[in-house]
Curated annotation (Swiss-Prot):
The keyword Transmembrane does not apply. Residues 203-205 are annotated as: G5. Residues 135-138 are annotated as: G4. HAMAP family: IF_2_A. The lineage of its organism: Archaea, Methanobacteriati, Methanobacteriota, Stenosarchaea group, Methanomicrobia. One of its GO terms (molecular function) is translation initiation factor activity. GO terms for cellular component: cytoplasm. Residues 20-27 are annotated as: G1. The keyword Nucleotide-binding applies. Function in general translation initiation by promoting the binding of the formylmethionine-tRNA to ribosomes. Seems to function along with eIF-2. This is Probable translation initiation factor IF-2. It comes from Methanocella arvoryzae (strain DSM 22066 / NBRC 105507 / MRE50).
Length: 594
């Protein structure tokens, strides 16, 4: 199908964000599209840094093999590769997400995973149109690969049982999408893409289905984004910082996506800094060659100007103060103060509202901080402080001011623990969790919290006087007094040395000194046991008599904890004994222990 290409000069390249669960094939998909091999350089084949790849229309037309019909007006696609998917929240322009479209990569064999669901929630939050690339169709048993073929062409040549598996796996994805509130189907069965999410089965390894994916993305951009892609061709550039990094021979640089206007060498720019916004001057602009991802440091072109939408590396003084996720805005010298005020207001709006008591959160960028705070809020984990930057000694000192041991905790997302903080950490009980995957952070914290609560409960239990009901056994008076030694049967709860015993009328008997079973001292006697007990205070035959029932005298504060905090954790016989004991105490004072 022949394609007319009258690229509109007032439309910028649509920005496409690639998201998905770890190892589901995000980077492999981009590699297949651009024909480079960044994956091989990545630790564990997982994307570690944010990148951007400009894929010109000519490349897309070659890959699509004439599938795209009609007049193409967009100049290509700019793909952003996000580590995990949380950097997506970093890539935002004022008032919404920076990405115009998103590709959610899902392993068709594994289906939705925790990060897949997190990604969909974020896309929904930012109202970003997206498609699903159901990757790894080549892993389906019996699949015969046809490299770089359109999906329907390769699908129709497969055996019937393989087609059946693809259909089943696709409808499993449709079902999961329905659970999350989205209508979806395989892309070739959709007539209205405004109401349905397209699922495109692909293989990043063989290239199958990728022509269909590019065709759908170009179609969506043409049909639904034309208005939002209009930009000021010569207006002052506006962009978002993807990453701040120090390059050998260049010093500090900022990898930036320019999404409006243009930026030139020599321009004054205002940048959102870690402390506050500030201005600097562009010394150089490095533009990746088309099809080359911005992370691959070799062979950049030095250019005089860059027009939206584009990934560019900016060289300028004082970039070490810049903060990833914040804005870059080109301005005249005379307007610098006004723009600084505008960015300050935006940063103020982005500040996190914290709880009175909670964990401390540190993240590498504003967007990351927002992402982790959203997840913590959903997990109902209170946040005491939230800030951008590495973990310092001052942060640990601040965490030490928290009294609740459950919240003397710091959660670090994509940050490092500074050396002075590491040294100080050895002298304190502050707990730090650090990860670059949000759900790992939350899982690790939850696991630790459960363990700590169990330990605290155990400790609380160990310190609390527990209820007990005992019977003075007939013919079991071994010594009458100083101390009285008698035989007792534990009828409910437990008996430990050191507790005071009372009668059902509330009168005190004395203090249990020792408990013996078969002539051996024991530290606890539980329900059903018959033991010899020495008691300081009473004389057998006078204050105490065989056949009588006695109760452990539980202090009022302890009984409150048992009745109102630990009620669900104690055994039935102990609970019944507690209730009998409370009835004795409340006979004269109904509010005792309440």
């Amino acid at each position: 199908m022949a394609t007319a290409t009258e690229i509109r000069k007032d439309l910028r390249t649509p920005i496409v964000c690639v998201m998905g669960h770890v190892d589901h094939g995000k980077t492999s998909l981009l590699d297949r599209i651009r024909g480079t091999a960044v994956v091989d350089k990545e630790a564990g084949a997982i994307t570690q840094h944010i990148g951007a790849t400009e894929v010109p229309l000519q490349t897309i037309q070659t890959l699509c093999k004439g599938m795209i019909g009609g007049n193409i007006v967009v100049p290509g696609l700019l793909f952003i590769d996000t580590p995990g998917h949380h950097a997506f929240t970093n890539l935002r322009s004022r008032g919404g997400a920076l990405a115009d479209l998103a590709v959610l990569v899902v392993d068709i064999n594994e289906g939705f995973q925790p990060q897949t669901v997190e990604a969909i929630k974020i896309l929904k939050q930012f109202k970003t149109p997206f498609v699903i690339a159901a990757n790894k169709i080549d892993r389906i048993h019996g699949w015969t690969a046809k490299n770089n073929s359109p999906f329907l062409q390769t699908f129709n040549s497969q055996p019937d049982h393989v087609k059946g598996i693809i259909e089943t796996k696709t409808y499993e994805l449709v079902g999961r999408m329905s659970d999350l509130g989205f209508s979806s189907d395989r892309y070739d069965r959709i007539r209205d893409f405004t109401r349905n999410i397209g699922i495109i089965p692909i293989s990043a390894r063989t290239g199958e289905g990728i022509p269909d994916l590019l065709m759908i993305l170009i179609g969506l951009a043409q049909r639904f984004l034309e208005e939002s892609l209009k930009f000021q061709v010569t207006g002052p550039g506006v962009g978002t910082i993807l990453e701040v990094k120090e390059e050998r021979g260049l010093g500090y640089t900022i990898d930036t996506i320019i999404y409006d206007g243009e930026i030139r060498v020599g321009d004054t720019i205002v940048i959102g800094g870690r402390e506050k916004p500030y201005s600097t001057k562009v010394r150089a602009l490095l533009k990746p060659k088309p099809n080359r991802e911005i992370r691959v440091e070799e062979r950049f072109d030095r250019v005089n100007k860059v027009t939206a939408a584009s990934g560019v590396k900016i060289l300028a003084p004082e970039l070490e103060k810049a903060m990833a996720g914040s804005q870059v805005r080109v301005t005249k010298e005379s307007n610098v103060e006004d723009i600084i005020k505008e960015i300050e207001q935006e940063m103020e709006q982005a500040k996190i509202v914290t709880d009175e008591v909670g964990v401390m959160v540190k993240a590498d960028t504003l967007g990351s901080l927002e992402a982790i705070v959203n997840e913590l809020r959903e997990a109902k984990i209170p946040i005491g402080r939230a800030d951008v930057g590495d973990i310092s000694k001052r942060d640990i000192i601040n965490a030490e001011t928290v009294n609740d041991p459950m919240y003397r905790v710091m959660l670090g997302f994509n940050v490092t623990i500074l050396p002075d903080a590491n040294d100080y950490l050895q002298t304190t009980d502050i707990k730090i969790f650090n990860s670059d995957v949000i759900y790992h952070l939350i899982d690790d914290f939850r696991k630790w919290e459960t363990e700590q609560r169990a330990l605290a409960e155990k400790k609380k239990f160990a310190e609390i006087v527990r209820p007990g009901k005992v019977k003075y056994l007939p013919n079991c008076t071994f010594r009458q007094s100083k101390p009285a030694v008698i035989g007792l049967q534990i009828m409910g709860g437990m008996l430990k040395p050191g507790v005071t015993l009372i009668k059902p009328d509330g009168s005190k008997i004395g203090v249990v000194r020792q408990i013996q079973e078969r002539n051996e001292n024991i530290s606890i006697a539980t329900v059903g046991k018959e033991v010899a007990v020495s008691i300081d205070g009473p004389t057998a035959g006078r204050q105490i008599n065989e056949g009588e029932i006695y109760f452990v005298d539980v202090p009022e504060g302890h009984s409150k904890v048992l009745e109102f905090q630990l009620k669900d954790t104690i055994k039935q016989d102990e609970l019944e004994t507690l209730m009998e004991f409370l009835a004795i105490k409340r006979k004269d004072n109904p509010f005792w222990g309440r």
